[in-house]
Amino acid sequence: MNRQSWLLNLSLLKTHPAFRAVFLARFISIVSLGLLGVAVPVQIQMMTHSTWQVGLSVTLTGGAMFIGLMVGGVLADRYERKKVILLARGTCGIGFIGLCVNSLLPEPSLLAIYLLGLWDGFFASLGVTALLAATPALVGRENLMQAGAITMLTVRLGSVISPMLGGILLASGGVAWNYGLAAAGTFITLLPLLTLPRLPVPPQPRENPFIALLAAFRFLLASPLIGGIALLGGLVTMASAVRVLYPALAMSWQMSAAQIGLLYAAIPLGAAIGALTSGQLAHSVRPGLIMLVSTVGSFLAVGLFAIMPVWTAGVICLALFGWLSAISSLLQYTLLQTQTPENMLGRMNGLWTAQNVTGDAIGAALLGGLGAMMTPVASASVSGFGLVIIGLLLLLVLGELRRFRQTPPVSDAG
């Protein structure tokens, strides 16, 4: 990357055809999954008029995703990764077709929606793990920060476009259009992915999958560096669960419906700015220290968010959280990929992604519990400032991560 620029260099898309193929596939996949994410809750709500049933579908899919990440990590370290990616994407698309067919029936089956949600959650996360494990081989470890930032932008852009497109489709054609286009998009992603080179895994002894997964847990616990990265990632994800308090906080600020949308947009916007301005981040000599400081800063932004006297100041705090958490996440991703042995990349990426799923759920549950005992303002502030205290303690305790130094990479991407 350009040492003179703070802006993200997109030249990796030009110089690395394999990464460009992954970029296209990922963007199409995010939009497709976004269409699905809009359609499933709406269809279940229309069929059952029960928010509990909607929540159950989210819980089941989340559980399937967690299992898929664990299984995918083992498979990605055992089998040729391109085959795992293609198999997972194709199988996931079959589930989308099933949802489309079910929605066209005179009486769609609720059980089928739940079962296909399990199917799609499992296979979607299976492919994600293999793709993450393959990224260092596709771009080179010296370009991982740049690849991570481009990927973050892809996710944010797709996450903005897909709900809007999904809402338009629901209004004009019903859920069948969402499911059908999600299936079509998933199969289209196979075209660029077929152009990827073979992605063999390093030779390693065959062992029971549970033993292989246990070995990854042991490595995580035995490595202060990798373990510290995973712990920080989980805490940042927990902090992002503050969004469950937006509706209640919006009432205290007397926000309109249109203004509430700004609360939800603030963190993604801040994260996008963080990715766009990450041009020199890969050249930092002490990434561990920057990660720790940016993480503590993001917690402080959450603590200040709810006690702001006006909602505009709260939005600024959320955007600041998005920016700082993006810096922390990019450094987590890069250090995890560069400091993990090649033969464990699949399992470690699976565990790291799984902590994002579980961290968000735990954070939402804790905020819900706090909300039962105190006001929404107090709940958000207590959680944010509590995480600040934990973050400061980790700044002292995680000495190896704090002192970690690296030689700035020399990228050939531009």
From Swiss-Prot:
Taxonomic lineage from the root: Bacteria, Pseudomonadati, Pseudomonadota, Gammaproteobacteria, Enterobacterales
Functional summary from the UniProt entry: Component of an export pathway for enterobactin.
Species assigned in the record: Salmonella choleraesuis (strain SC-B67)
Disulfide feature: none
HAMAP family xref list: MFS_EntS
Keywords attached to this entry: Cell inner membrane, Cell membrane, Membrane, Transmembrane, Transmembrane helix, Transport
Protein name according to UniProt: Enterobactin exporter EntS
GO CC annotations on file: plasma membrane
Record-level Gene Ontology MF annotations: enterobactin transmembrane transporter activity
Topology of this chain in the membrane: Multi-pass membrane protein
Alphabetized CDD domains for the sequence: MFS_MefA_like
Cytoplasmic side, ranges: 1-21, 77-83, 131-156, 200-218, 278-287, 337-356, 400-414
Residues on Periplasmic side: 43-55, 105-109, 178, 240-256, 308-313, 378
Family: Belongs to the major facilitator superfamily. EntS (TC 2.A.1.38) family.
